[in-house]
Amino acid sequence: MISGVPDHVDGRMLAITEQAGGSIINRDRMWHYVEGIRNWAPLWTDHAIRILPGPSSLWLDARGKRLPVPLYPGFDTLGTLSHIMSTGFDYSWFILTKKIIQKEFALSGSEQNPDLTGKSWRQVLGRATSGVPGPVKAFMEKGEDFIVEPDLPALVARMNALVGGEPLLELAQVKHEIRARDRQLDNPFSKDMQITALRGARAYLGDRLIRTAKPHKMLDPANGPLIAVRLNILTRKTLGGLQTDLDSCVLGTDGQPVEGLYAVGEAAGFGGGGMHGYAALEGTFLGGCIFSGRSAGRAASRAVG
């Protein structure tokens, strides 16, 4: 795996709190992303950047087989992670075109989104018209996980070369998967659920403008060049945390509050450890983080009089 957090984010305070008597629950629950790429200009060890993908890229496993329904880009992180690991490999592939990458690829991290961090509406709106975003283009040119070629045979050859060892990808298999997908674009009542999903996404104006490319055939040279991206597993966070009561006071292994010790937000498993369900993440947890912080503040205020 590659690292989605800096070296100093090591969770050591959870262990220190446990040594002080605090109880940790759900320590087996982790959240790892499956769209990780190595940063060509790393800021920490094994620095990973996550691709925030639109719905159009074709997702293949290490042997070139398409991931099953509904494991499409941006759909189900935990389900996709489980499937990828069941293949016996720890990486997968996106196959896409220049038309897709210029509209559908966003990258995590403030340094990868200068338009947002710079608070420039002009630059944000430019995502709809300005071609491949600068940070994405830099990865296309310098990122070790990106391959750009004008035709499929050359693309597959370089994909195998990137991984090294015995070639795992067969040109015929990859071509079969792409052709099967492309054929469904001829049918307005597509039997391909991913095609149906991206057509549905484009029904929303915002996605049509800056997030979802117009459906097109990947093997049509007019839509090229072809692009392959090796996707690595990247670490992010534990979904477990310190067990607390309703005042956000840390509980000991005996179930009693540890006096003067509080835990909120991520340290408490996002407000209690699983209170939003197993597959919920990110913005879904904001309410629990804020609420647990408020509870801790009020309880601490009462404790000190």
Describe each region flagged by the PLM.
Residues 1-40, 282, 286-295, 299:
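Glycine-rich loop(s) and the adjacent beta-strand/alpha-helix scaffold that form part
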Residues 14, 23-169, 173:
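An anion/pyrophosphate-binding glycine-rich loop and adjacent beta-alpha core
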Residues 82-104, 268-280, 284-292:
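Short, solvent-exposed cationic patches
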Residues 52-54, 236-238, 282:
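Short, small/polar residue-rich loop motifs at catalytic or cofactor-binding pockets
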Residues 166-271, 275, 279:
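A glycine-rich dinucleotide-binding beta-alpha-beta segment and adjacent secondary-structure elements
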